[in-house]
């Protein structure tokens, strides 16, 4: 399909609020866009800590395995519900502080509350009656689960308005929109690197000796310390950005009495489903490609360190001491691989715009890197086979050879290339397509988020049972993920419309009819 043609929306087309014309004067200076994008570093620092430190913390609290998946499921569930709602209201917020800033500030405050509950769950549980000798600390688990859910809600409250704010600052300029999302992806990588580095340092708790208590061992103390650093970084970048970058107060466009009556009669989720009803073909294609892309990504994001511990190192979390140690070494190597992945992601994010131009556009770049993702996921089978062959000659508890370990870590690093595109291009295309169709940035990005979280829920619920059907291990899910990545690449190249070089400025629209 050729370049996406702008179609001026009609009154029946619905409708979703966007910026008024006076807010679309010129794109904001790059320094302001970078300032807002830097909030991603604070958000992602906390996410990296979750991945690197919460597993031993969960074991410390004694959360049963059958319930742990439900706790991790809260991310996509809260994303599916919270982000569209936040996007809806941020498109229509009339606060004197602007449309996006109140939500970003609220999200940052909720993150502070959440990490406090998570970090001090063991201490609060002990004060409320948990016994140190008990394996399962019920009260601490309840506090931890509450904090974990609040943290996911807070992150979704932050990220949607941040991306919508970047789209506002780009003022309908397609190139500036792509650059803004590339910087957002870059700062996500910065936050990841900082988080994984902090999580891998076992003596970080010495910065704050008070973090170690009778109920809180070294893992717990390190978690507290890391979260203190995380919230400090998040508050610094958030306060700086919200103070430095102006967010104009929004006023709804004039409507007649019939419009007001119809708008007020439509409930919130009517607006959300209405967005699907009036969505143009480019946005539908974007949702399909994005959903397939995340079916490909999420199994690896969930099981990458487990794959290192189980298939590459040959360990077992439920085996004997030597087997458990091998598994632990594999998980630590996986965390190192994630750091390499984040470093590559960061550098790739800075070059997304230039590389996209050289390859002929954003959709072509996305299609190509999806094939890189498919090849990388398929290579996990080869790395696993080499690791198994080495154990046949060196012994079951020998661990991987240096070449196998290097190959696995290289795989982590290479996958940082497609991940950088996944974190930037779909959001940039959603902003561009919504500007062309007149849809609100916040709600459009919230709808796009559904194409991300629904695949995550499917993988979270079905990944384990699917692997068990084929004898366990992580490879069955990785193979399906590779196939999904290849299909996503084909669709990105064939059915996804090319965005215009410079999208025209959005037109003001009335309420939903």
Curated annotation (Swiss-Prot):
Primary location group: membrane
Keyword annotations from UniProtKB, A to Z: Membrane, Phosphoprotein, Sugar transport, Symport, Transmembrane, Transmembrane helix, Transport
Cytoplasmic-side segments: 1-32, 89-101, 161-178, 246-282, 356-365, 430-441, 496-513
Compartment annotation: Membrane
Name of the protein in question: Sucrose transport protein SUC1
GO biological processes: pollen germination; response to nematode; sucrose metabolic process
Gene3D superfamilies, per the entry: MFS general substrate transporter like domains
A single GO molecular function term of this UniProt record: sucrose:proton symporter activity
Reactions the enzyme catalyzes: sucrose(out) + H(+)(out) = sucrose(in) + H(+)(in)
pH and activity: Optimum pH is 5-6.
Region feature (Disordered): 1-26
Reported regulation of activity: Inhibited by DEPC, protonophores (e.g. dinitrophenol and carbonyl cyanide m-chlorophenyl-hydrazone (CCCP)), and SH group inhibitors (e.g. N-ethylmaleimide (NEM) and p-chloromercuriphenyl sulphonic acid (PCMPS)).
Function in brief: Responsible for the transport of sucrose into the cell, with the concomitant uptake of protons (symport system). This transport is both voltage- and energy-dependent. Can also transport other glucosides such as maltose, alpha-phenylglucoside and beta-phenylglucoside. May also transport biotin. Required for normal pollen germination and anthocyanin accumulation induced by sucrose.
Membrane topology: Multi-pass membrane protein
Extracellular topological intervals: 54-67, 123-139, 200-224, 304-334, 387-408, 463-474
Effect of residue 65 to S: Reduced sucrose transport activity, reduced sensitivity to DEPC
Pfam families in UniProt: MFS_1
Taxonomy, superkingdom: Eukaryota
Organism of origin: Arabidopsis thaliana
């Amino acid at each position: 399909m050729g370049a996406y043609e702008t179609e001026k929306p009609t009154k029946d087309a619905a409708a979703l609020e966007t910026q008024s014309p006076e807010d679309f004067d010129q794109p904001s200076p790059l320094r302001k866009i970078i300032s807002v994008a830097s909030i991603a570093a604070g958000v992602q620092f906390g996410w990296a800590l979750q991945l690197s430190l919460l597993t031993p913390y969960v074991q410390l609290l004694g959360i049963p395995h059958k319930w742990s998946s439900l706790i991790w499921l809260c991310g996509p569930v809260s994303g599916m519900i919270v982000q569209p709602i936040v996007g809806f209201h941020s498109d229509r917020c009339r606060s004197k502080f602007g449309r996006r800033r109140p939500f970003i500030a609220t999200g940052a405050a909720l993150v502070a509350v959440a990490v406090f509950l998570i970090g001090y769950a063991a201490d609060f549980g002990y004060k409320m009656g948990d016994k140190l000798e008990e394996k399962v600390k019920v009260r601490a688990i309840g506090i931890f689960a509450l904090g974990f859910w609040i943290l996911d809600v807070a992150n979704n409250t932050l990220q949607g308005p941040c991306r919508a704010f970047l789209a506002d600052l780009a003022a309908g300029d397609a190139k500036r929109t792509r650059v803004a999302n590339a910087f957002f992806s870059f700062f996500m990588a910065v936050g990841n690197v900082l988080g994984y580095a902090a999580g891998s340092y076992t003596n970080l708790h010495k910065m704050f000796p008070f973090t170690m208590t009778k109920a809180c061992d070294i893992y717990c103390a390190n978690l507290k310390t890391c979260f203190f650093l995380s919230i400090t970084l998040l508050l610094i970048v958030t306060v700086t950005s919200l103070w430095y970058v102006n967010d104009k107060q929004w006023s709804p466009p004039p409507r007649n009495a019939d419009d007001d009556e119809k708008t007020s009669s439509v409930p919130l989720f009517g607006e959300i489903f209405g967005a699907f009803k009036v969505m143009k073909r480019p946005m539908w294609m974007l949702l399909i490609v994005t959903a397939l892309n995340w079916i490909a990504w999420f199994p690896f994001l969930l099981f990458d360190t487990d794959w290192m511990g189980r298939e590459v190192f040959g360990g077992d979390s439920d085996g004997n001491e030597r087997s458990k140690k091998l598994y632990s070494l594999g998980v630590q190597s996986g965390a190192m691989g994630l750091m390499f992945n984040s470093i590559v992601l960061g550098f790739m994010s800075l070059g997304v715009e230039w590389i996209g131009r050289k390859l002929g556009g954003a959709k072509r770049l996305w299609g190509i890197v999806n094939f890189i993702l498919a090849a990388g996921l398929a290579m996990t089978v080869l790395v696993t086979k080499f690791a198994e062959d080495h154990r046949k000659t060196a012994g079951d508890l020998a661990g991987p050879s240096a070449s196998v370990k290097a190959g696995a870590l290289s795989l982590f690093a290479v996958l940082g290339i497609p991940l950088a595109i996944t974190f930037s291009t779909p959001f940039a295309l959603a902003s561009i397509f919504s500007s062309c169709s007149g849809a609100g940035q916040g709600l459009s990005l919230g709808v796009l988020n559904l194409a991300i979280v629904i695949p995550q829920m499917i993988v979270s619920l079905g990944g384990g049972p699917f692997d068990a059907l084929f004898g366990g291990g992580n490879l069955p899910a990785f193979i399906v993920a590779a196939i999904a990545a290849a299909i996503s690449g084909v669709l990105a190249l064939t059915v996804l419309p090319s965005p215009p070089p410079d999208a025209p400025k959005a037109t003001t629209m009335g309420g939903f009819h």
